[in-house]
């Protein structure tokens, strides 16, 4: 029904049409009552040359998450503090998320972790900002286990306190690489399936980075999810794991808006949960992403790997948003495979479609905001910003 009318694609466990429609109804019913979290996090894995398109170089990638969060909240503004880093192609997905969150009239909550700066805009503090980004995963010592457990407990407490459905999104430069490391730590061979913000995923580079990190981690017998995040993960994973479990304990549906980084969270939780609770846990958990990320089917394969390993029925939904008709190259670049996802673009745009907004309306507003960004000098023109 809705999937055919709106062009929503399902992926993962698609066996039950009634279940698909029920998922759509749950989302549609809860649009106006959602709590959206954008977790912006720092990992020094992002400083590896060529690892991420979230900024044209290592220096710019340090500011990407702050600039994304600012734009998500404020949109194009002459009073912006953070310039959006120049990308080789495309434009920040925060543009999509800003436009669509305004359309559905939801104000996101920003959670900064390991950013090393106190944002001037409204945000939720959960740890000492002086802790800074997690170490590069190649060290095998990304964070202390104490920090991981503290972030998990903070996320758990916040999740359990919620009385409304939750959407979790992220801006974590280098995060797909830490996601791959987490999944491979638990035995999933995913190096050819994990996506990238880059047009051509740096698979060989990531393979080497992950291999080195896992070697240096030197896991002992009976290691758990917290051990893995401490060794090769990032702050986003530790906090989001708690937030997801807490929200489900509060019986709230949860939308994980993204790709492989969200699947890494699912995997960490499934490894942690008692076997008998897995089906109930996964029933009202949604993966929502952009159509650009599911084009080559690798995300579908990744979801099915997790479904098979843990004997669950995780279902994904892909937003029908497209920029084929856009007059701007930066937006049409998405159709060529650049950027693809981030800052909750897939999940938040999906909600806008379910709320009745049309593709041409969203494209028009994205174009308008892009014009304003350029006019206000909000995108850096320097390759080193």
UniProtKB/Swiss-Prot annotation:
Pfam hit, one: DBI_PRT
GO MF, one example: nicotinate-nucleotide-dimethylbenzimidazole phosphoribosyltransferase activity
Source superkingdom: Bacteria
CDD domains to which the protein is assigned, alphabetical: DMB-PRT_CobT (cd02439)
HAMAP family membership: UPF0284
Record family assignment: Belongs to the UPF0284 family.
Protein name, entry field: UPF0284 protein A9601_04941
Species for this entry: Prochlorococcus marinus (strain AS9601)
